[in-house]
């Protein structure tokens, strides 16, 4: 009996070990599959600096004038300190920036969306922007009040992109069969994408005000569903080295992660030199970023940018 029990226990143990190995191997395959899946999405890269140098001086000046970005910032009353920081920092570099709030706020000028639902706020803001500014701006950039954006880098990234084509870009995320641009890093739509989205906003079957599921899905996923019906698909924005330029984390957190995973290349492993956005910032961090991006210079280092994007008329930006 003892030998039979012993054999039985050995069999159970061996079977358990075998099952554990199969599970581990399965996870390895699944994980690898996810990594492969991550690279199936569309990639959009910034232009090479060499290409910019080939452009004549007159063409560069025309480009700097013609690139116009309209910035949409979705805010709520609880975000008032972030709202103030965003208003005083990077939005001054947009050709025009407007704040869309969930309710009327006396402290700052904003466009009242009269709803607390983020998806409804986003829909209304996009419709307002397209109806009013479709003939004045080529690109529409939407962000949270926790996002810091370097608009000049955004313009540089978009330099060779045609706004009459349906672009929808930022930091892409895969969720089942749906690929979407995460709102944390900011969302960019060309005027053609805005046109297509606007044509669907009144068609509930294709772009419902509420998701067609029992549970609520996030506003950035809702947007992706609507745009998919319009033939507009999410594209991941990267620099020439394949690094993301729309970041869903702050610089501090990105550096902390780089110190863990790339201890010998912290700066190189952290972020792109041409980063467009960072997210998750406090009001103080907004001002620190503003100083670092637009004011701090190393003596003796000369920056020879081949193209300069002119600030909006009457702007008091840095």
Curated annotation (Swiss-Prot):
<dbReference type="GO" id="GO:0030168">
    <property type="term" value="P:platelet activation"/>
</dbReference>
<keyword id="KW-0225">Disease variant</keyword>
<dbReference type="InterPro" id="IPR026050">
    <property type="entry name" value="C1GALT1/C1GALT1_chp1"/>
</dbReference>
<keyword id="KW-0812">Transmembrane</keyword>
<keyword id="KW-1133">Transmembrane helix</keyword>
<keyword id="KW-0735">Signal-anchor</keyword>
<dbReference type="GO" id="GO:0036344">
    <property type="term" value="P:platelet morphogenesis"/>
</dbReference>
<feature type="topological domain" description="Cytoplasmic">
    <location>
        <begin position="1"/>
        <end position="6"/>
    </location>
</feature>
<feature type="topological domain" description="Lumenal">
    <location>
        <begin position="27"/>
        <end position="318"/>
    </location>
</feature>
<comment type="similarity">
    <text>Belongs to the glycosyltransferase 31 family. Beta3-Gal-T subfamily.</text>
</comment>
<keyword id="KW-0472">Membrane</keyword>
<feature type="transmembrane region" description="Helical; Signal-anchor for type II membrane protein">
    <location>
        <begin position="7"/>
        <end position="26"/>
    </location>
</feature>
<comment type="subunit">
    <text>Associates with core 1 beta-3-galactosyltransferase (C1GALT1), probably not with the soluble active form.</text>
</comment>
<comment type="function">
    <text>Probable chaperone required for the generation of 1 O-glycan Gal-beta1-3GalNAc-alpha1-Ser/Thr (T antigen), which is a precursor for many extended O-glycans in glycoproteins. Probably acts as a specific molecular chaperone assisting the folding/stability of core 1 beta-3-galactosyltransferase (C1GALT1).</text>
</comment>
<dbReference type="GO" id="GO:0070062">
    <property type="term" value="C:extracellular exosome"/>
</dbReference>
<protein>
    <recommendedName>
        <fullName>C1GALT1-specific chaperone 1</fullName>
    </recommendedName>
</protein>
<keyword id="KW-0143">Chaperone</keyword>
<dbReference type="GO" id="GO:0006493">
    <property type="term" value="P:protein O-linked glycosylation"/>
</dbReference>
<keyword id="KW-1068">Hemolytic uremic syndrome</keyword>
<dbReference type="GO" id="GO:0000139">
    <property type="term" value="C:Golgi membrane"/>
</dbReference>
